[in-house]
């Protein structure tokens, strides 16, 4: 499948997406840097390799924006949490997803790894999940409470599945959700655009990665985030 966006067209497309959803994107927020956490959802080879049956065509173009956010959070001394969508090789955790999807990402396989360009640092939390939402049957909520998080920035793939499901679950738990339109990707632009509209209408402030990075930098004490 051909990508609906490239690194060269991303800025223009992202501005168009924000303009399109502006009637719904009516809850502007600024990051509370001291209580913010970045969630990087499923940036794995399984979803970003063009040869994969689950290739996410919009994923490669947004990788630099995800990297921008990772660097911004690390530079501000704020936590970065990664997720990996995996299933046990014995298939016992597949459930309906076995029937719904072609192929699955097996725990321990090379395809299950996060792409090297975005790899977690030693000590950074990696959540292993078996369903779309990073909150479902994981320890993510416990970790966030221990971090005293209030603001969550959700990025990664796919916009309309794991990212949206995670954002919804975060909202249900009373977190403020920030969703950068240019740091998430889906299989088609229609799916991406529809998800952004739903997010803006119901449970997230949809903005741009550079705006969020700038807010972190502005809040950093002198000497940090440089």
Q: Language-model features: where?
A:
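Active-site-proximal loop->helix
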Residues: 188-200
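Short acidic-hydrophobic, aromatic-tinged amphipathic segments that line or gate anion-handling sites
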Residues: 127, 205-212
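Short gly/pro/ser/thr-enriched loop/turn and capping motifs at secondary-structure boundaries
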Residues: 161, 184-188, 213
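Glycine-centered short loops/turns at secondary-structure junctions
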Residues: 75-78, 148, 174
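Internal catalytic-core helix/loop-beta-alpha segment
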Residues: 108-156
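Short glycine/serine/threonine-rich phosphate/pyrophosphate-binding segments
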Residues: 160-166
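A short glycine-rich beta-strand->turn/loop micro-motif centered on a GG-aromatic cluster
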Residues: 153-156, 176-189
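Active-site acidic carboxylates
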Residues: 1-121, 125, 216-226
